Swiss-Prot record:
GO terms for cellular component: cytoplasm. One of its GO terms (molecular function) is isomerase activity. Coiled coil: none annotated. It is found in: Cytoplasm. GO terms for biological process: protein refolding. Gene3D superfamilies: GroEL, GroEL-like equatorial domain, TCP-1-like chaperonin intermediate domain. The lineage of its organism: Bacteria, Bacillati, Bacillota, Bacilli, Lactobacillales. It comes from Pediococcus pentosaceus (strain ATCC 25745 / CCUG 21536 / LMG 10740 / 183-1w). This is Chaperonin GroEL. Pfam families: Cpn60_TCP1.
Length: 539
């Protein structure tokens, strides 16, 4: 396919138009009085959202060169979302500000490579200053405030704070759609995996159709049990102690399962059998997790262990086990806290090293199950459109909260970025590098300016007033007042603010140093085929 090439100012001007079109759409959503954007869907009702990355990804421009500029800004939003889970609109606003100021200087004759070095120096200094002013997340209220600001909803803030309190900072919090109009929180404490009882005759509560085992022993194996004689010695040991038993095995076949069910129905002892969770290597890892959590040993050929030789000491234990037709939940396992902590450390290390999103998700699930449990936020709304919008907000709030737990938080509302401007005076730079530093100084004002303008105020006036305030005091656009942002609970995660600035600076510097742009030439529509002779009049 033939290509069209644009050079120098022509190339940069076209890309700048694309940057502005996307950024102008996204930045209207920033702040407590930001607006929504309606996105057409190929099917179904349109989506109404104020989520920066969702809007950015939805935009495709007709002009190829403009579209490339827009896609680079979309990349900033996506990268920020991937790293921090929020801050995509801030990243977009910063990118537009840096690119626009940079383009003016490059057009006036400045060297773009020198400007890029200045931008990089200033960004590095600003990030350092952000870390210095960062506050550690210490209380449930801190979490609630961060989630409330991100979602623009105090109720969501409380919900996420409650969820994190229940399952811990490493716990899994999932967001699902509810069938009702209320948004609720369900917490599954302990370790849960998606395998239910092998026979409904094992239930102990016929109303709920679930099996409850109090203070049970747990036999954990990756073997198939086909002969009851294989596990008879350990069954007798359990019966002698008048305890119940949970069997987790690859499968129970032949006469073994009916024999277990028969003994359960006769009241000989209380037993429930479930299949081992996962597949392949993941199954082995999950069984090992269960063993460590319950203080047991996985009976496997890898360790040279046979079912006939299992002793009571090799069984796991827990305070309670609940088994439904779909799930098994182990509460308060009897495993050593030291061994659990060591296992958690190994999984965290694997999470930091893996490059696969799927593997990372599975590792985080395992980590949560060992660390405390799983919380499910069920999002309810009156309409499907409202449900989607609400779900986006809660996802952003959850991501922001996790980011704050990781790196702390800074004053919100763009105040932190404006406060670090004074730190850039220490950056050593001359000529075009100094120009690059000044471009970043000017861009750091932009989030405050845009938040004010979305609230109906004059952005330049608010920025000038902010410079006269002591550090940490900022403009609360929601109530049109000047407050100490941290005391007022208006805070942003440090990781979100830092990532937004770093990603904006990175892509902006690339745009400014662009000298040529190559795009596909639009195809001419071919002429319609002529009708075959003698076919006229046919319908």
């Amino acid at each position: 396919m033939a290509k069209e090439i644009k050079f120098s100012e022509d190339a940069r001007t076209k890309m700048l138009k694309g940057v502005d079109k996307l950024a102008d759409t996204v930045k209207s959503t920033i702040g407590p009085k930001g607006r929504n954007v309606v996105l057409e869907q190929s099917y179904g009702s349109p989506t109404i959202t104020n989520d920066g990355v969702t809007i950015a990804k939805a935009i495709e421009l007709e002009d190829h060169f403009e579209n490339m500029g827009a896609k680079l800004v979309s990349e900033v939003a996506s990268k920020t979302n991937d790293i921090a889970g929020d801050g995509t609109t801030t990243a977009t606003v910063l990118t537009q500000a840096i690119v626009n100021e940079g383009m003016k200087n490059v057009t006036a004759g400045a060297n773009p490579v020198g400007i890029r070095r200045g931008i990089e120096k200033a960004t590095s200094k600003a990030v350092e200053a952000l870390h210095k002013m960062s506050h550690e997340v210490k209380t449930k209220d801190d979490i609630a405030q961060i989630a409330s600001i991100s979602s623009a909803n105090p109720e969501v803030g409380k919900l996420i704070a409650n969820a994190m309190e229940k399952v811990g900072n490493d716990g899994v919090i999932t967001i699902e759609e509810s069938r009702g109009v209320d948004t609720t929180l369900d917490v599954v404490e302990g370790m849960q995996f998606d395998r239910g009882y092998m026979s409904q005759y094992m239930v102990t509560d016929n109303d709920k159709m679930e099996a409850n085992l109090d203070n049970p022993y747990i036999l954990i194996t990756d073997k198939k049990i086909g002969n009851i004689q294989d596990i008879l010695p350990v069954l007798q040991s359990v019966v002698e102690q008048s305890r119940s038993l949970l069997i987790i095995a690859d499968d129970i076949t032949g006469e073994a399962l009916p024999t277990l069910v028969l003994n359960k129905m006769r009241g000989t002892f209380n037993v429930v059998a479930v299949k081992a969770p996962g597949f392949g290597d993941r199954r082995k890892e999950q069984l090992e997790d269960i063993a460590i959590l319950t203080g047991g040993t996985v009976i496997t050929d890898d360790l040279g262990l046979n079912l006939k030789d299992v002793t009571i000491e090799q069984l796991g234990q827990s305070n309670k086990v609940t088994v439904t037709k779909d799930d098994t939940t182990i509460v308060e396992g009897a495993g050593s806290q030291e061994q659990i902590a060591e296992r958690v450390g190994i999984i965290k290390q694997q999470i930091s090293e893996t490059t696969s999103d799927f593997d990372k998700e599975k590792l985080q699930e395992r980590l949560a199950k060992l660390s405390g449990g799983v919380a499910v936020i069920r999002v309810g709304a009156a309409t499907e459109t409202e449900l989607k919008e609400k779900k986006y907000r809660i996802e952003d709030a959850l991501n922001a909260t996790r980011a704050a737990v990781e790196e702390g938080f800074v004053p919100g509302g763009g105040t932190a970025l404006a406060n670090v401007i004074s730190d850039l005076e220490d950056v050593e730079a001359e000529g075009d590098e100094a120009t690059g530093v000044n471009i970043v100084r000017r861009a750091l004002e932009e989030p405050v300016r845009q938040i004010a303008e979305n609230a109906g105020e004059e952005g330049s006036v608010i920025v000038t007033k902010l410079k006269g305030q002591k550090p940490g005091v900022g403009y609360n656009a929601a109530n049109d007042e000047w407050v100490d942002m941290v005391e007022a609970g208006i805070v942003d995660p440090t990781k979100v603010t830092r990532s937004a600035l770093q990603n904006a600076a990175s892509v902006s510097a690339l745009l400014l140093t662009t000298e040529a742009v190559v795009a596909d030439l639009p195809e001419d529509n071919p002429a319609p085929a002529a009708p075959a002779p003698g076919m006229g009049g046919m319908m």
